[in-house]
């Protein structure tokens, strides 16, 4: 999705192909090694500390690289979190485009929307600290991934004949906001299964499917 820049270049229209890691220019061995060290260190930091408090100095020290090396790749900790999320989000995007139903093509739109919710919640459950570090506040709406999700949900709404699909898109993506999921799981004590069942029910109600 990127070469260390702030956000990925994702397809945000059905006619464009995803830019996957396999299509990116090959890195030099030392650059690839540094990137791997940075991401491995960041994975640990984001999973053990408050993402909002992580600094570039901490990341550089944990990765065993110089500050200049870190800043050449990433402008801030949020960009590092984005890089860690990229691989997981690419896989979900690939499944939406060409995977088996109901996540991929071939199922009714309500079932596909429900499957998307379940997959996205699973992603949040596994990588919530990263999501909180990368996709909270206004940054969520400008991310390439959010643009991709918007196009996908809109296509399902149109297929399902939902009136005024453009007004529904962001309302339907709101349950997947990392801050909301964190509140539901860690403040309200809701299980991931309970949240998933609720949003799957919402998907089918919107599409008027039983």
Which residues does each predicted region cover?
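Short amphipathic alpha-helical elements of helix-turn-helix/winged-helix folds
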Residues: 41-45, 95, 123, 175
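Short hydrophobic/aromatic patch on the recognition helix
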Residues: 64-74
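Alpha-helical DNA-contacting segments of helix-turn-helix folds
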Residues: 81-88, 127, 131
């Amino acid at each position: 999705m990127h070469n260390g820049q702030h956000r990925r270049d994702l397809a945000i229209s059905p006619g464009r192909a995803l830019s996957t890691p396999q299509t990116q220019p090959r890195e030099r061995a030392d650059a690839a090694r540094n990137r791997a060290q940075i991401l491995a260190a960041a994975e640990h930091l984001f999973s053990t500390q408050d993402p909002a408090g992580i600094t570039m100095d901490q990341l550089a020290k944990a990765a065993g690289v110089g500050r200049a090396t870190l800043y050449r790749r990433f402008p801030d900790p949020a960009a590092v979190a984005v890089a860690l999320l990229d691989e997981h989000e690419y896989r979900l995007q690939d499944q939406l485009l060409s995977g088996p139903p109901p996540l991929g093509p071939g199922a009714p739109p309500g079932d596909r929307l429900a499957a998307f919710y379940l997959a996205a919640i699973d992603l949040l459950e596994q990588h919530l600290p990263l999501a909180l570090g990368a996709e909270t506040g206004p940054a969520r709406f400008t991310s390439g991934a959010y643009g991709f999700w918007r196009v996908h949900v809109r296509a399902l709404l149109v297929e399902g004949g939902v009136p005024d699909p453009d007004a529904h898109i962001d309302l339907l993506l709101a349950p997947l906001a990392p801050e909301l999921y964190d509140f539901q799981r860690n403040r309200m004590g809701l299980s991931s299964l309970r949240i998933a069942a609720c949003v799957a029910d919402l998907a089918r109600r919107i599409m008027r499917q039983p």
